[in-house]
Amino acid sequence: MATKGRWSRLWVDDFDMSTKTASAEVSMSIATEEVTAFQATAKEFITTDPESSIKITGYVSNIGNNAGGWEQELHDRFGAANTSQVGLMLADSATGDAGMPTYVLPATSVDEDKISAPASGVLGINGSFMAGDYGLRRGICLWYGSVTGTGNKTSFDIGAAGSAGGDVYVWVFSITGGATNASIKVQSATTSGGSYSDEATVTFSAVGGFTAAMTGAISQWLRVNIASMGGASAISLAVVAAVDGVTQPA
């Protein structure tokens, strides 16, 4: 049975744009160019760099200044430096976020921004985030929601161990009570109930998108550890881990 796209989620830096997005499209392609020259016995081609993007269609639900609406957030990132972190999580249920594949543009900006204003309809918007400086990454969502204290979250089996490191991506949407050096760890173990080792730590004192590298061997079971709330009473965030050679090509 086909899976509904309605449970997908879209994150842009410190904004959860899920309820303002009508559709999203992940695009990946590898082009070739003909390089046939004299003396060639057949046509010759080379493979060029891969290209990728995340395109969105959404609604202009709020046009107030700094209100987190699509109109301003796309415009602010149009042709800007590649500093935005965008993630598209594909989910198969309303609450089953952990373990869901998530496509991440770690350092991107907007290269297309279209607004429609029909007299008899709603304000609509179309935009595209380009590959940016680090291309497209595929990871697994380990946590999405609010945390109110330190401790471990449920572990998840990523299917195999990795040997070439990877990256952790964190989106912090809101902080209640303020935070100073709050920290989130991603840990791994060979079994669900095994001994966990720290693979990466992300520290933050404000909302936004953050990343940290994982190096070397990474075990098959991953979990999020809320190491410090930084003085906050609640933090809303999403955590994604991309393991080279497991969740994406090495």
Model-predicted segments: where are they?
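Solvent-exposed edge beta-strands and adjacent loop segments
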Residues: M1-I63, A98-M130, G135-G139, Y144-S146, ...
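Extended, low-complexity, turn-rich repeat/linker tracts enriched in Gly/Pro/Ser/Thr and Asp/Glu
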Residues: N62-N65, F173-N181, M229-A234
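Exposed aromatic-hydrophobic patches
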Residues: T154-I158, G208-G216
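Beta-strand signatures of extracellular beta-sandwich domains
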Residues: S183-Q187, V240
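Solvent-exposed serine/threonine-rich low-complexity stretches and specific carbohydrate-binding patches
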Residues: S197-V207
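Noncatalytic modules at the cell exterior or secretory-pathway interfaces
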Residues: V122, G165-V170, G216-A238
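Short, acidic/charged, Gly/Pro-enriched secondary-structure junctions
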Residues: N65-D111
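Edge beta-strands of jelly-roll/beta-sandwich modules across compartments, strongly enriched
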Residues: I125-G127, R138-I140, G230-T247
